[in-house]
């Protein structure tokens, strides 16, 4: 199957089928922001703006990589980009592999920069494709978008389940090091299985500028592949995908694992502004989500703006109730507790819950 056809299949499945984690959550329910009964600030004067990788954002949010690579995905990316431009948030594109294989698909990606000339836009390529296509081809992906950064996605769980997946991860860290020589920041991005502190240390050493943890709790790409396998009659891949549907490190745990190495983006089950606030209070520099905007984007930009505006208003309320007048205060001064499964996990991983308030300013 061509990459382009697979991309439209993925989009349709995410729009129509239940693809989120089944039995493992992101961990946000284990996180409690300590309420300030005396916030002593005006809610309407709270400043959501922040800087991320040298670019100013009106709010600490990125519309995560969703799609591209098929003509039918162009209006979806256009709607997302228009919303990003209007609200001043960042936006990523789906894997640009299809544009390497077929230059006619470039417009499904470049429309994002066309519709969002001032936004923080990041490109996207799989780690496996760096080895396959080489650094010059990857550089063209940056130029295609006039991108402010490039995400290198680590989706080896999906590759292991996908019948046509690339299962060769040899030399991947060296390839990432090579990509880090490009003249844009590189974001190492998991796609639903999270990143550990051990891998975060290796990625920092390789030269990445940020880590998007892509933890368990949101879209399960193993789950997406279950539907593809079922529809094609591939019972072995279907069973394998079901077994690994919830495999990996949940988002909150992964943020705590990675936060001391490089700036972190919290992705994976972020569904409300309260989730964004909790992410930043744990040390993330921004939060991100994709699935909540698929349905709205299929309708149009106004629907995306409405959905995202709701989340940003929820973030503002959370900041007000924590007495935080700006994003830096939320990241460095808010008080937070972690209980339940997440506390047990981070304790076993050597993280002292008493150190939650010690957040690095990287």
From Swiss-Prot:
It is an enzyme of class 5 (isomerase). It is found in: Cytoplasm. One of its GO terms (cellular component) is cytoplasm. GO terms for molecular function: FMN binding; isopentenyl-diphosphate delta-isomerase activity; magnesium ion binding; NADPH binding; oxidoreductase activity. Pfam families: FMN_dh (PF01070). GO terms for biological process: isoprenoid biosynthetic process. Mg(2+) binds at residue 159. FMN binds at residues 65-67, 95, 124, 189, 219, 269-271, 290-291. Its main location: cytoplasm. Belongs to the IPP isomerase type 2 family. Homooctamer. Dimer of tetramers. This is Isopentenyl-diphosphate delta-isomerase. It comes from Methanococcoides burtonii (strain DSM 6242 / NBRC 107633 / OCM 468 / ACE-M).
């Amino acid at each position: 199957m061509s990459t382009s056809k697979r991309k439209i299949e993925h989009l349709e499945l995410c729009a129509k089928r239940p693809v989120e984690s089944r039995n493992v959550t992101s961990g946000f329910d284990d996180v409690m922001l300590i309420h300030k009964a005396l916030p002593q600030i005006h809610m309407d004067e709270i400043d959501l703006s922040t800087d991320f990788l040298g670019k100013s954002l009106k709010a600490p949010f990125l519309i995560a990589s969703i799609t591209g690579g098929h003509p039918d995905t162009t209006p979806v990316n256009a709607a997302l980009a228009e919303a990003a431009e209007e609200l001043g948030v960042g936006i990523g594109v789906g894997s640009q592999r299809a544009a390497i294989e077929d230059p006619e698909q470039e417009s499904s990606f470049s429309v994002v920069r066309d519709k969002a000339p001032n936004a923080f836009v990041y490109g996207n390529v799989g780690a496996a494709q760096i080895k396959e296509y080489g650094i010059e081809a990857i550089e063209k992906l940056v130029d295609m978008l006039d991108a402010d950064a490039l995400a290198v996605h680590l989706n080896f769980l999906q590759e292991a389940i996908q019948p046509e997946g690339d299962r060769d991860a040899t030399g991947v860290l060296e390839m990432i090091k090579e990509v880090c020589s490009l003249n844009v920041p590189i974001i190492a991005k998991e796609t639903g299985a999270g990143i550990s502190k051990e891998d975060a240390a290796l990625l920092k050493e390789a030269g990445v500028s940020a880590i998007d943890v892509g933890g368990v709790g949101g879209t399960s790409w193993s789950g997406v592949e279950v539907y593809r396998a079922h529809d094609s009659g591939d019972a072995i891949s279907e069973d394998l995908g079901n077994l690994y549907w919830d495999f990996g490190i949940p988002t909150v745990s992964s943020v705590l694992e990675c936060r001391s190495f490089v700036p972190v983006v919290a992705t994976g089950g972020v569904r409300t502004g309260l989730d964004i606030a909790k992410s930043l209070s744990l040390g993330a520099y921004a939060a991100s989500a994709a699935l909540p905007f698929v349905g709205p984007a299929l309708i149009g930009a106004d629907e995306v703006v409405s959905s995202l505006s709701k989340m940003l208003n929820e973030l503002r309320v959370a900041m007000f109730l924590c007495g935080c007048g700006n994003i830096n205060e939320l990241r460095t001064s808010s008080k937070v507790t972690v209980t339940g499964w997440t506390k047990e996990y981070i304790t076993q991983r050597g993280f002292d819950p008493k150190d939650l308030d010690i957040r690095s300013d990287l």
